[in-house]
């Protein structure tokens, strides 16, 4: 009995010790006890001086140094913010990083204009396709065409996948000429080409515009050429590339019978315009001593030089900027790369260093065998299925096609054509991997 009572006593002592240990552990986690009050006679201790710091984000105006204020509670996100974020998520393509594109106001969109008549439907659609493949910002397409082509443009553009149609809106306009004889304008150089001269008059609500010919292809985001608008000084209102890099073998310097810009003229196949400035400028001219508004100048200018011009509206633009050189910004040839830049030997240094940014397949080179390098690029973009992998379905087949063009002068420099498109595809691929796989899972 004594042994049992001793065992019971020891068990009770052990339980009591365990209970005390638990209580002390719980008390240790609580706030420390307050310090005893300092006697009134005790000397005041001044804290060591603290280096001055900028007030933190929680500091309040008028707070004394050393006094820390509690940060105000974070406001709950408004429903509008959540709605905007939801819209942005819906508007992003798979693999596209978060940006303000989805909620970008319409006045900040890129505006792209093209004039298409006759058999230019397919060429125009391929150009528009190249624009949406790589662009980041939303684009407003302004398509000027004949009545017979309007239904087909609408039909084809609406058949594109949703992930691409959400990147643009399009509007189709009739061919119209506000001054002079419409039939004369329509027959100037190529069918409907003179329409571009009237864009500042027709698109009165558009501030800035990128005009391109139907035979143009974008090999990098349209956003990049749009940024050149920021480089305009206070007098510049349009931008174009030189017609030729070597004036002594250029067309204008050898054959032109009218004034032209600079030493070699400019090519109007890719033209960036500040329409607001164009509409508000009085242009110097050879007809009257005072300036003329853009619309008032066009028909008298055509009447004066119509027997001397060869390249139609491009010649008229050269004449305008001959008398108003301060109004033109000249961008490098990589933004308007044509067969002339390689068929006589490479003569576009910017493209050699940076690669072709905008390809201009003039003289019908997309549809014949004279320049197979240009044709290979056109067919690669035309035949690319929207939802396929860019590297597998466009870039690698393009490299194989380029192997068949090495016997041509343009085909001997494939890196000039591939540099920008490869860089653009890599950027798109890296964004896709980082967004969908995550940076910590890439190794």
UniProtKB/Swiss-Prot annotation:
The record's subcellular location field reads: Membrane
For region Disordered, the annotated ranges are: 32-84
Q: Where is the composition biased (Low complexity)?
A: 32-45, 55-66
Q: Which Gene3D superfamilies match?
A: Spore Coat Polysaccharide Biosynthesis Protein SpsA, Chain A
Q: Which InterPro entries match?
A: Glyco_trans_8, Glycosyltransferase_8, Nucleotide-diphossugar_trans
Known glycosylation sites: 233, 274
Q: Residue ranges under compositional bias (Basic residues)?
A: 67-84
Against Pfam families, the record matches this protein to:
Glyco_transf_8
Give its E.C. classification number: 2.4.2.42
Which Gene Ontology molecular function entries are recorded, alphabetically? UDP-D-xylose:beta-D-glucoside alpha-1,3-D-xylosyltransferase activity; UDP-xylosyltransferase activity
Q: How does it sit in the membrane?
A: Single-pass type II membrane protein
Cytoplasmic side of membrane: 1-4
* Chain ranges passing through the membrane: 5-25
- One annotated GO biological process: O-glycan processing
Instruction: Give the first-level EC class, as a single word.
Output: transferase
Keyword annotations for this protein? Glycoprotein, Glycosyltransferase, Membrane, Signal-anchor, Transferase, Transmembrane, Transmembrane helix
Q: Which residues lie on this side of the membrane: Lumenal?
A: 26-443
- Family membership noted in the UniProt record: Belongs to the glycosyltransferase 8 family.
Function of the molecule: Glycosyltransferase which elongates the O-linked glucose attached to EGF-like repeats in the extracellular domain of Notch proteins by catalyzing the addition of xylose.
Query: Could you identify this protein by its name?
Result: Glucoside xylosyltransferase 2
- Species this chain originates from: Homo sapiens
The organism's lineage is: Eukaryota, Metazoa, Chordata, Craniata, Vertebrata
């Amino acid at each position: 009995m004594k042994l049992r009572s001793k065992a019971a006593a020891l068990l009770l002592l052990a339980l009591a010790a365990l209970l005390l240990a638990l209580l002390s552990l719980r008390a240790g986690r609580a706030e420390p006890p307050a310090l005893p009050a300092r006697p009134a006679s005790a000397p005041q201790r001044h804290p060591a001086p603290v280096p001055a710091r900028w007030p933190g984000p929680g500091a309040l105006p008028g707070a004394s140094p050393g006094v820390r204020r509690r940060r105000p509670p974070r406001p709950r996100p408004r429903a509008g913010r959540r709605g905007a974020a939801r819209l942005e998520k819906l508007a992003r393509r798979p693999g596209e990083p978060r940006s303000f594109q989805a909620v970008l106001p319409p006045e900040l969109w890129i505006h792209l204009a093209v004039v298409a008549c006759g058999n230019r439907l397919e060429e125009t659609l391929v150009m528009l396709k190249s624009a949406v493949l790589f662009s980041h910002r939303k684009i407003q397409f302004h398509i000027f065409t004949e009545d017979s082509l309007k239904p087909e443009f609408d039909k084809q553009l609406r058949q594109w996948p949703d992930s691409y149609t959400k990147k643009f809106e399009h509007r189709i306009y009739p061919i119209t000429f506000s001054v002079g004889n419409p039939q004369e304008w329509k027959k100037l150089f190529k069918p409907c080409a003179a329409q571009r001269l009237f864009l500042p008059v027709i698109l009165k609500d558009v501030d800035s515009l990128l005009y391109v010919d139907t035979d143009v292809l974008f090999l990098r985001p349209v956003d990049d050429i749009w940024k050149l608008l920021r480089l305009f000084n206070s007098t510049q209102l349009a931008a174009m590339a030189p017609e030729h890099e070597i004036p002594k073998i250029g067309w204008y310097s050898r054959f032109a019978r009218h004034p032209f810009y600079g030493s070699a003229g400019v090519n109007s196949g890719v033209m960036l315009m500040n329409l607001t400035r164009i509409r508000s400028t009085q242009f110097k001219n050879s007809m009257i001593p005072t300036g003329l508004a853009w619309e008032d100048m066009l028909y008298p200018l055509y009447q004066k030089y119509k027997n001397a011009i060869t390249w139609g509206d491009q010649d008229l633009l050269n004449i305008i900027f001959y008398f108003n050189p301060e109004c033109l910004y000249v961008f490098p040839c990589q933004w308007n790369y044509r067969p002339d830049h390689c068929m006589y030997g490479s003569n576009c240094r910017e493209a050699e260093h940076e690669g072709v940014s905008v390809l201009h397949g003039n003289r019908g080179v997309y549809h014949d065998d004279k320049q197979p390098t240009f044709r290979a690029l056109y067919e690669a973009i035309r035949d690319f299925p929207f939802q396929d992998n860019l590297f597998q379905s466009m870039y690698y087949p393009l490299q194989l096609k380029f192997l068949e063009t090495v016997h041509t002068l343009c085909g001997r420099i494939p890196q000039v054509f591939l540099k920008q498109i490869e860089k653009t595809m890599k950027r798109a691929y890296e964004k896709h991997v980082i967004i969908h796989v995550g940076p910590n899972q890439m190794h």
